[in-house]
């Protein structure tokens, strides 16, 4: 069938299989063109492996370091006239290319928050690898979590804490810049968001992997966070998500102590750059900030996407054969170029004057839109979008599909 983008709010409800495959191919080619990673990881588990930073780290591990990878995610296969979710197509393309290159790549589709999926993953690691996982990437962005022990359902929200937040935001599809007010979160919303986006599940994963002897001596585990400039702090760093991320950082310190004493291992937080992802598109204010950031970083020739960010994380931080450089809080900073004083000063200056009339010229909102569509496989060169495509794509390592996630 012919697949066109259908955008509702900040979500595109369709995905293009060939476009997603082309996008993954571009990332793989980038990783292959870099100098090979010496002393890189050999057996990598990526939790949240199908899009964004998770997918990019899987590609860098596989095609940059020749690592075997197992990816866990919750994606939807095609059904009837409904396309699969982008992460499904991404993984189908990744596995196919990895297998053709002689690389081990298997995936598990299901709720990473559940005990069942953790057990399935552990069984696969024991059966195929006999343990020895030397890198665990934790990259989950989810709106809800069912607690595996209590069955309690938590929903995450993006809200400020304490007082109503007033600023401006942009509708990226129309380019309309308008004022936005966001009501503060309740105590329950703060706790719920921490339960979904904090470090609780990361710790459950690492503890389970450790208990079943799946981790190698010297193992590293990395989770991702974002700090950003003061401009976004009220809605992000000082809001509900920021509170959850503080919990994630606290978890990193606890896991680091455990892994260090048991396996001479490390648990680390990587502070990444602001990028167009399905998750960031949902945050008010942030798309306008990213549109300005893209323009300035591109002008200064320091713009990076997910794959460039993950390459730099592996090459210059995790596997540089030096001590891993961190900030005063022990975090890896690959948001260093975004947070450069000259970049932030320019954004601050433009922020005051940006409006509907000048947003297309002052910012790179066109680049934002382009990246947004690319997440779903649209707008890629060399794809004929008027031609019908087969929307059912198999992921080689997945035979049965679980209940469709919403």
UniProtKB/Swiss-Prot annotation:
It holds the Pfam family Eno-Rase_FAD_bd. GO terms for biological process: fatty acid biosynthetic process. The record marks 75 as: Plays an important role in discriminating NADH against NADPH. It comes from the Bacteria. Keywords: Fatty acid biosynthesis, Fatty acid metabolism, Lipid biosynthesis, Lipid metabolism, NAD, Oxidoreductase. Gene3D superfamilies: NAD(P)-binding Rossmann-like Domain. It catalyses: a 2,3-saturated acyl-[ACP] + NAD(+) = a (2E)-enoyl-[ACP] + NADH + H(+). GO terms for molecular function: enoyl-[acyl-carrier-protein] reductase (NADH) activity; NAD binding; trans-2-enoyl-CoA reductase (NADH) activity. Its EC number is 1.3.1.9. NAD(+) binds at residues 48-53, 74-75, 111-112, 140-141, 245, 275-277. Substrate binds at residue 226. The keyword Oxidoreductase applies. Pathway: Lipid metabolism; fatty acid biosynthesis. The active site is at 236 (proton donor). It is an enzyme of class 1 (oxidoreductase). The keyword Flavoprotein does not apply. HAMAP family: FabV_reductase. NCBIfam families: EnoyACPredFabV, PRK13656.1. Involved in the final reduction of the elongation cycle of fatty acid synthesis (FAS II). Catalyzes the reduction of a carbon-carbon double bond in an enoyl moiety that is covalently linked to an acyl carrier protein (ACP). PANTHER family: ENOYL-[ACYL-CARRIER-PROTEIN] REDUCTASE [NADH] (PTHR37480:SF1). Monomer. Belongs to the TER reductase family. This is Enoyl-[acyl-carrier-protein] reductase [NADH]. It comes from Coxiella burnetii (strain CbuG_Q212) (Coxiella burnetii (strain Q212)).
């Amino acid at each position: 069938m012919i697949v066109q983008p259908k955008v509702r709010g900040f979500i595109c409800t369709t995905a293009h299989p060939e476009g997603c495959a082309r996008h993954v191919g571009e990332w793989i080619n980038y990783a292959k063109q870099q100098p090979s990673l010496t002393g890189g990881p050999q057996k990598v588990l990526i939790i949240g492996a199908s899009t964004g930073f998770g997918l990019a780290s899987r590609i860098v591990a596989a095609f940059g370091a020749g690592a075997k990878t197992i990816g866990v995610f919750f994606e939807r296969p095609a059904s009837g006239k409904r396309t699969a979710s982008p992460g499904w197509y991404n993984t189908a393309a990744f596995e196919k290319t990895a297998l053709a290159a002689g690389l081990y790549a298997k995936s598990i589709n299901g709720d990473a928050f559940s005990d069942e999926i953790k057990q399935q993953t552990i069984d696969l690691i024991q059966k195929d690898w006999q343990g020895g996982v030397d890198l665990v990437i934790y990259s989950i962005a989810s709106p809800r979590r069912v607690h595996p022990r209590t069955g309690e359902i938590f929903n995450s929200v993006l809200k400020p804490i304490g007082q109503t937040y007033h600023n401006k935001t942009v509708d990226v599809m129309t380019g309309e810049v308008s004022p936005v007010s966001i009501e503060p979160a309740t105590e329950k919303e703060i706790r719920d968001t921490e339960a979904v986006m904090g470090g609780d599940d990361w710790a459950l994963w690492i503890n389970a992997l450790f208990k079943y002897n799946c981790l190698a001596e010297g193992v590293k585990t990395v989770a991702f966070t974002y700090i950003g400039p003061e401009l976004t702090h009220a809605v992000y760093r000082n809001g509900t998500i920021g509170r959850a991320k503080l919990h994630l950082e606290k978890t990193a310190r606890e896991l680091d102590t455990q892994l260090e004493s048991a396996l001479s291992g490390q648990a680390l937080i990587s502070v990444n750059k602001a990028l167009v992802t399905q998750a960031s598109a949902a945050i008010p204010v942030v798309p306008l900030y990213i549109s300005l950031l893209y323009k300035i970083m591109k002008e200064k020739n320091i713009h990076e996407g997910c794959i460039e960010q993950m390459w730099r994380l592996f090459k210059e931080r995790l596997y540089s054969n030096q001590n891993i450089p961190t900030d005063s809080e022990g975090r890896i900073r690959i948001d260093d170029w975004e947070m450069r004083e000259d970049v932030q000063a320019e954004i601050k200056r433009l922020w005051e004057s940006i409006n509907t009339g000048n947003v297309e010229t002052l910012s790179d909102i066109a680049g934002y839109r382009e990246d947004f569509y690319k997440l779903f496989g649209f707008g890629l060169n060399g794809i004929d979008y008027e031609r019908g495509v087969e929307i059912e794509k198999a992921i080689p390592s997945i035979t049965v599909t679980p209940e469709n996630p919403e």
